[in-house]
From Swiss-Prot:
GO terms for molecular function: ABC-type oligopeptide transporter activity; ATP binding; ATP hydrolysis activity. The chain crosses the membrane at residues 42-62, 93-113, 169-189, 192-212, 281-301, 315-335, 677-697, 724-744, 801-821, 828-848, 909-929, 941-961, 1120-1140, 1170-1190. It is found in: Membrane. Residues 12-23 have a biased composition (Low complexity). This is Alpha-factor-transporting ATPase. Residues 1-10 have a biased composition (Basic and acidic residues). ATP 1 binds at residues 408-415. Residues 373-609, 1035-1321 form the ABC transporter domain. PANTHER family: ATP-BINDING CASSETTE SUB-FAMILY B MEMBER 10, MITOCHONDRIAL, ATP-DEPENDENT PERMEASE MDL1, MITOCHONDRIAL. It is an enzyme of class 7 (translocase). It catalyses: an [alpha-factor](in) + ATP + H2O = an [alpha-factor](out) + ADP + phosphate + H(+).
Length: 1323
């Protein structure tokens, strides 16, 4: 924990250097070697080459010994060697085989470990460079990114592919290259003419490898690009679930997501076709080499120009050479996917830096604190080709050591002043001078240490406690968060009226109100205590009493220090304090406040008496006197217990037991489409597996003909016969290889497409409690990576596990049975190795399950660090805490590297053991077979047949180990997908054209139940039409009680509410914080189900509660019809990165909804009419792009990366550029939100604090809009605005979840009740 009672000065300050030196080289290429630092990596590369090269030489020595054994056999039959001498020589040669196998195992193990470690190093450098770019880029760079989260989700996958290519793929490539060179030398030495004949097909192999590799590279690039777009859509819906529900855009997003992943699948099918065709051609050509090699070899034997030893050695070398060439082309095809991944990474890293970042290279750090601040002829324009001036020739001074106020209506440029002063953006023209030095020449660290900006919507770090969220403001001054004296944090918390400092935000951050978050932000500022403080609407979410108290405390604290207030409230401005008035980006007036009182904006404020505060929205307050009732205590809210729970969750995740492959496939069986096609693919894989022992039988016959030739027998007829059979089998193997591989890859991709669609659909149909509950363990980055990246590994369960299993079973059974029939004595010796191989494979698989899961969990931690940095980047820059976040990232990366080294050790041994088993098995089989020959129990034809069958069987069984890492990664992905699907509640909302045909109970413990499917909802009641003609009541609540599900502690927000709202009336809801006002609006929009309750007793007690819209049950109305009936304007409206037009019409043109109006679209004239109504038409027309102007994500002050495709409702891409984006003010966004709601032509309009945080002029516009709508539709608003209360037909006063008063404004104000108490605090 934090250190107690220590002096701040006793702790050393960190170095002022933000960046630590990196061993990563500059990016000069776009291939898998782009992060290799040869000056540092050469020892590792050299050792890796020597080890894998040594293992290749060991393979060559095996080939030589095989040739010697065949030579000894030929001499024995020619009676050139005695029985005793023959047996002794065979023993020596077989012992040599075992010795070479042991050496090769050690070399492969160490070599694989070396290259896997090398791959981990490249991965670390890639992640570090990505992180350095992210944390060093300017805010304008972030604003220009249209798909940052989607891009980085895909880049994370590309980094893993880069690691794999620099690890096991490069190891196999080095081994294969050395093996090819050695085999060429060996084969040419034995018989150059035979070698040339056998190598005749090599040019064709090389040409096929080049052509199909080119296709693979292009298809992989396209798949990566489209997948990143799909990731963006998914992330938007997961981070902004309420937006998707407000505007009935579930089908729009689902359709868009389906189109993208189906397009991605098409590219994968092309990739699979290229890889399968390449593999098939190479397999066919390699097998054909047998025919041409033996034909020519037998010719040489018959003419006595070559010995049997030379022929076998040459032929074995060429055979292995052909397999090596085939293998290297397959490796190069995989390497091409790595090059495509590297191209994606380099494309991101090589993006040009912003102008602001380039200026940092020449900045300086003055030795004194900030004094005078002057803006001189400052212009700031939007980041667009047809730029819009946000500030125009602005010149003013900030009075040093005094209080300064920047006021003006929304969109006048007030917040831009603060962002320019913090160097989040650079001025377009003019200068900002601090003590006569241009701000562009000052080090950003100097700016951040001397100036603190508190924004209206502060960021709360959800992985930290309240204390850590406060302490992070000065973490740069200490070695760590824990080194900060705790009493300093307590003092800051006390200043900001905060308690419960150990409360864990991982569980509770979603329950914080805006006011509570702002108090944490104020505590940070107090702790930092910088010379200059900028407060940008930093009190706007506080209730009046708390706000007034904190303002007084801040002004007392800041006496004698430069303080800048950006505000819409003027009652706390003293007559002699400095005020700057902005209007349309220009200075309208500046001077003492007493000289400004005749300004229009000040007069508007005085005449309306507006108080634009927004009360805190939850009953939990962190003020010192706040206590939970004893009866509501829940042990899960204890901060220390929560820490234990969090660590336990993390530990459980790391040690998650993986499901079996068959268990995963059984659970997900409903999503596996085309089972007949899958069965056909498996059957083809079995045929391919059967072809191997059949070909090995033909191979034994060809060997026999060679021995016949070596002892002088005529074998021309046999050679012709078995050569033709071998050619037929080679072609059959190639055809079945292509068809089985492509079909199974197709089925695997088709499966994950279905899984992605189903998961997206089910997540999109959860109520809001799934996304905001305390037991929601899925972060946005984690679930996006799982669904979009890890499912690529999941398809291995079909594309690799099934053919592997089919091949293993078919080859093993047929090989064993055939060998027993051919010669049971020798066969039984060979068969004894098969159980051992399978046992070791199973044990190795279990070990891999554990290490792969731990490794992937650490990868997720590193990716989560990157995601957190992106989503909180502005706060990180404002408080200059980049070094802290970089340290956290490096520590997690270090942990990942250590797990990666351990994983490399365990993975490497799998490759090594298979070679050892093959060598020992073949040596013992050869020894015992030769013994049977020497005892004349077997003839050489029978011997070769059994040895060949057993050798193929044992070798192929050993290869299973090589496939285990990929299958294990697929197992992990499948386990977590199943876990996600089980976590998704079955309380599905009624969707438009989609429903769930089978659902499960919440928290079902059965692992074998159906996961549901996407299909039509059959209950016609769900499509009930909303009619309003004969109903006088628009809204009716009957005995409604409600508690937010999955939130701690369980407290009823509504208690037996009964409420009737007549048609065409305007109703206001008022009350203190936590009284349940906004909860009513959320229930009306069906964001939560009132039937869901934390315990069954509560559910039974309130089973008769109902909510009706125009006398129809709210929960039986189709969501499309509901969104046509009700529109909502939230307190903090959100917009995606798209055009103004797309944002205004988002969800309107959703014509796929069952029961919805197919003609529900809006015309340009309707848009113009609504924009004029909300007083925005003239402003939007003044923009260079008009309605096609792109809105920045930063417009929302939203750091969650909620981006969306720039496509219209028909899925057509709108041609836009990030250079045409524009940033809107809070007031403009609020007016756009009202316009967006009115364009839906609703019958009921809900407004939640629609005038909070706005200037008097914008507030007046909104009030006039509401007045103009009176009598045309039913309006229900939540407010603390006195002027807005006056225009309501009826006011509903709430307290502690109950309605305590009703009536119009004048009636309630004269009753001296709860309403009077509320209005007194406002007035």
């Amino acid at each position: 924990m934090f250190q107690e009672k220590s002096e701040k000065s006793s702790f050393p300050k960190r170095s002022s250097s933000l960046r630590s030196p990196s061993d990563s080289p500059a990016i000069t290429s776009k291939n898998v070697f782009m992060f290799v630092n040869y000056s540092k990596d050469w020892p590792l590369i050299l050792v890796g080459i020597l080890l894998m090269g040594g293992s290749a030489i060991a393979t060559l020595m095996n080939t030589y010994i095989y040739g010697e054994i065949m030579g000894k056999l030929s001499q024995f039959y020619l009676q050139d060697q005695s029985n005793h001498s023959f047996s002794q020589d065979i023993v020596k040669l077989c012992v040599g085989l075992i010795g070479i196998g042991c050496c090769k195992m050690i070399l492969v193990w160490l070599g694989m470990f070396t290259w896997l470690k090398f791959g981990e190093i490249q991965q670390s450098r890639a992640r570090m460079q990505i992180y350095n770019k992210i944390i060093n880029e300017s805010q304008s760079w972030y604003d220009s990114k249209q798909n940052l989260i989607g891009q980085l989700t895909q880049i994370n996958r590309c980094i893993e592919e880069l690691r794999s290519c620099n690890g096991e793929i490069l190891a196999s490539l080095m081994q294969t290259i050395v093996l090819i060179l050695a085999l060429l030398i060996m084969s040419f030495y034995q018989s150059w003419s035979t070698t040339l004949i056998i190598m005749a097909s090599f040019p064709i192999m090389a040409l096929c490898g080049w052509y199909f590799g080119k296709l693979t590279y292009k298809a992989q690039q396209d798949e990566n690009e489209v997948t990143s777009k799909a990731s963006k859509v998914f992330n938007w819906c997961y981070v902004n679930p309420e937006m998707v529900r407000f505007f009935n855009s579930k089908n729009i997003e689902l359709t868009k997501f389906k189109q993208l992943i189906e397009k991605s699948a098409q590219f994968y099918y092309k990739l699979s076709h290229a890889v399968a065709a390449n593999t098939a051609v190479l397999k066919t050509l390699t097998l054909m080499m047998f025919v041409q090699g033996f034909w020519f070899g037998n010719y040489l034997l018959s003419h006595k120009t070559i010995t049997i030893n030379q022929l076998f050695t040459c032929f074995s070398s060429c055979l292995m050479l052909g397999q090596a060439v085939s293998g290297i082309t397959e490796l190069l095809a995989i390497l091409n996917t790595g090059h495509a991944a590297a191209d994606k990474i380099s494309g991101f890293l090589l993006q040009p830096p912003s102008k602001a970042k380039l200026l940092l290279l020449h900045s300086k750090y003055p030795p004194f604190e900030i004094g005078s601040i002057y803006f001189k002829n400052v212009w700031f324009e939007s980041n667009s080709q047809n730029s819009v001036a946000i500030l125009q020739d602005v010149s003013f001074g900030i009075l040093q050591n005094q209080f300064n106020y920047v006021i003006g209506k929304s969109g006048s440029g007030k917040s831009t002043i603060a962002k320019l002063l913090m160097r989040l953006y650079s001025v377009s023209r003019g200068t900002i001078e601090i003590d006569t030095v241009s701000i562009d020449k000052l080090d950003p660290k100097y700016i951040c240490q001397n100036i603190t900006l508190l924004e209206q919507n502060p960021v709360i770090f959800d992985d930290k406690t309240i204390a850590e969220n406060i302490a992070i403001a000065i973490v740069d001054d200490y070695d760590s968060l824990q080194a900060i004296p705790y009493y300093l944090i307590e003092q800051s918390a006390h200043f900001a009226l905060l308690s419960d400092l150990d409360l864990n935000m991982k569980v509770n951050h979603l329950t914080l109100s805006g006011g509570q978050q702002q108090r944490i932000s104020i505590a940070r500022a107090y702790l930092k205590n910088s010379p200059v403080l900028i407060m940008d609407e930093s009190f706007s979410a506080l209730d009046t009493e708390t706000k007034q108290g904190l303002i007084e405390k801040v002004k007392k604290w800041r006496i004698g220090k430069t303080t800048i207030f950006i505000t819409h409230e003027y009652k706390n401005i003293l007559d002699d304090e400095n005020v700057i008035i902005l209007d349309q980006g220009m200075i309208k007036n500046q001077g003492q406040f007493k000289k400004m009182k005749n300004e229009e904006i000040v007069q508007n404020y005085k005449s309306q008496g507006i108080e634009t505060s927004s009360y805190e929205t939850t009953s939990q307050s962190f003020s010192d006197n706040t206590k939970l009732p004893d009866g509501d205590y829940n042990y899960k809210t204890n901060p220390y217990i929560l820490k234990d729970l969090e660590s336990q969750i993390k530990e459980d995740t790391d040690n998650e037991k993986l499901m079996g492959v068959l268990a995963i496939l059984r659970y997900c069986s409903s999503t596996i489409n085309g089972k007949s096609l899958l069965g056909f693919g498996i059957l083809l894989a079995i045929f391919q597996g059967v072809s191997s022992p059949v070909f090995s039988y033909c191979f034994s016959k060809l060997l026999s003909t060679s021995l016949d030739s070596s002892i002088g027998l005529n074998s021309t007829q046999k050679i012709l016969q078995w050569s033709c059979i071998s050619l037929s089998i080679a072609i059959f193997t190639g055809v079945t290889s292509y068809l089985s591989e492509f079909i199974l890859n197709y089925c695997g991709e088709n499966w994950i497409v279905s899984l992605r669609q189903l998961t997206f659909f089910k997540l999109n149909n959860q109520d809001l409690s799934f996304f905001t509950g305390f037991d929601t363990n899925w972060s946005s980055s984690e679930i996006t990576a799982l669904l979009m990246n890890d499912t690529r590994d999941l398809r291995n369960l079909i594309s690799q596990f099934f053919p592997l299993l089919a091949n293993l079973v078919s080859m093993t059974l047929i090989g064993i049975i055939w060998s027993i029939v051919s010669g049971w004595k020798l066969a039984l010796v060979g068969i004894s190795f098969v159980p051992l191989v399978l046992l070791v494979t199973v044990l190795y698989g279990k070990i891999l399950e554990s290490i792969e899961n731990k490794y992937k969990c650490k990868v997720n931690n590193v990716e989560l660090d990157l995601y957190r940095t992106i989503t909180t980047i502005r706060t990180i820059k404002i408080f200059n805490i980049q070094q802290y976040f970089e340290t956290v990232f490096k520590e997690d990366l270090k942990v990942l590297n250590s797990i990666g080294v351990y994983r490399a050790l365990q993975t490497g041994i799998g490759f090594a053991i298979s070679d050892l088993f093959s060598s020992i098995g073949q040596a013992i089989i050869l020894f015992y077979g030769m013994k049977l020959i020497s005892q004349f129990q077997y003839n050489y034809s029978q011997l070769l047949q059994v040895i060949t069958l057993l050798s193929f069987t044992i070798s192929n069984a050993s290869i299973l180990i090589h496939q285990l890492p990929e299958i294990t990664r697929g197992q992990r992905a499948g386990t977590f997908i199943v876990k996600l699907l089980k976590d998704i509640t079955s309380t599905m909302e009624v969707n438009d054209s989609c429903g769930v045909s089978s659902v499960r109970k919440r928290n079902s413990k059965s692992g074998s139940d159906s996961i549901g499917t996407i299909g039509p909802v059959k209950d016609n009641q769900l499509f009930k039409k909303v009619t309003t003609d004969n109903d006088t009541l628009a809204i009716s609540f009957n005995n409604v009680s409600f508690s937010y599900p999955n939130k701690l502690p369980y407290i009823l927000q509504l208690k037996s509410i009964s409420l009737d709202v007549k048609k065409f009336t305007t109703i206001g809801i008022v009350g203190q914080s936590g009284s349940g006002k906004s909860t009513i609006l959320k229930i009306l929009f069906r964001l939560y189900d009132i039937k869901i309750s934390p315990d069954s007793n509560t559910t039974k007690k309130y089973h008769d509660q109902t909510v009706k819209i125009f006398n129809q049950n709210l929960y039986l109305i189709n969501s499309g019809l509901l969104c046509q009936t009700i529109a909502i304007v939230p307190q903090f409206p959100k917009f995606f990165s798209g055009t103004i037009y797309d944002n205004l019409t988002y969800g309107i043109n959703n014509t796929n909804s069952a029961g919805s109006n197919s003609s529900s679209s809006v015309s340009d004239s309707e848009i113009i009419k609504i924009l004029k109504l909300v007083n925005l038409h003239q402003f939007i027309v003044s923009l260079p792009q008009g309605l096609l102007t792109i809105m920045n994500d930063s417009d929302n002050d939203n750091d969650n990366g909620n981006e969306n495709e720039n496509e219209n409702e028909n899925g057509n891409t709108i041609s836009t550029s990030s250079s045409t984006s524009f940033t809107f003010s809070g007031g403009q966004l609020q007016l756009l939100a009202i316009a967006r709601a009115l364009l839906r032509n609703p019958k009921i309009l809900l407004l939640d604090e629609c005038t909070s945080n706005l200037d008097p002029i914008t507030t007046k516009i909104i009030i006039n809009v509401i007045k103009s709508l009176h009598g045309k539709l039913t309006i229900l608003f939540v407010t603390h605005d006195k002027e807005l209360m006056r225009i309501a037909d009826n006011l509903i006063v709430m307290k502690d979840g109950q309605i305590v008063e009703q009536g119009d404004f004048q009636q309630l104000i004269s009753n001296d009740g709860e309403f009077t108490k509320i209005t007194k605090t406002i007035i």
